[in-house]
């Protein structure tokens, strides 16, 4: 299913010097987001920084949201992950998409202008309405929590 989402270019380099987000293949779930920087940024081990993307989106449909996720190669090869682990973009947000990055690696990492730093995936949203009850219907699991189902 294809859904149109309004996007506003906040930095004129986006679409010119830095490509617009696109799906790499017909089966891709995520769109790459790029660091819209004037100069390279050095991210020291243990450091975090907030990177602009040069884009704003307005999803407008309350049955959708976007999540900003790490790129697997940055985390696995360089230890660079999202500072907030996952970013959630609500349907009514209209500000610039910013990406918090954290270097959990042992080496400094240089982020170049236009470098792909994260990916964005659109997801369906179900808004719940809570129903106050005194008890729940019994289940096999019950209140079993962390580690309850074992390792094998």
From Swiss-Prot:
The keyword Magnesium belongs to this UniProt entry's keyword annotation: yes
One GO-annotated biological process of the protein: dUMP biosynthetic process
Entry keyword Cell wall biogenesis/degradation: no
UniProt keyword terms in alphabetical order: Hydrolase, Magnesium, Metal-binding, Nucleotide metabolism
GO molecular function: dUTP diphosphatase activity; magnesium ion binding
Record: residues binding substrate: 71-73, 84, 88-90, 98
Taxonomic superkingdom: Bacteria
Cofactor requirement: Mg(2+)
Functional pathway: Pyrimidine metabolism; dUMP biosynthesis; dUMP from dCTP (dUTP route): step 2/2
EC number(s) on file: 3.6.1.23
InterPro entries xref list: dUTPase, dUTPase-like, dUTPase-like_sf, dUTPase_trimeric
A Pfam family this chain is assigned to: dUTPase
Family: Belongs to the dUTPase family.
Function, as annotated: This enzyme is involved in nucleotide metabolism: it produces dUMP, the immediate precursor of thymidine nucleotides and it decreases the intracellular concentration of dUTP so that uracil cannot be incorporated into DNA.
Name of the protein: Deoxyuridine 5'-triphosphate nucleotidohydrolase
Organism name: Klebsiella pneumoniae subsp. pneumoniae (strain ATCC 700721 / MGH 78578)
């Amino acid at each position: 299913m294809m859904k149109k989402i309004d996007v506003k270019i906040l930095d004129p380099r986006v679409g010119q010097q830095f490509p617009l987000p696109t799906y790499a293949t017909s089966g891709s779930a995520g769109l790459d987001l790029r660091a819209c920087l004037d100069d390279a940024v050095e991210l020291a081990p243990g450091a975090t920084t907030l990177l602009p993307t040069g884009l704003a989106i307005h999803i407008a449909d309350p049955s959708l949201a976007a999540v900003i996720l790490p790129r697997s190669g940055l985390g696995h090869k360089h230890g660079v992950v999202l500072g907030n682990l996952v970013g959630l973009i609500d349907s009514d947000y209209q500000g610039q998409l910013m990406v918090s990055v954290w270097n959990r690696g042992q080496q400094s990492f240089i982020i170049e202008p236009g470098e792909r730093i994260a990916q964005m995936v659109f997801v369906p949203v179900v808004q719940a309405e809570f129903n106050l009850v005194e008890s729940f219907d019994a289940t096999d699991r019950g209140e079993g929590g962390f580690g309850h189902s074992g390792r094998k």
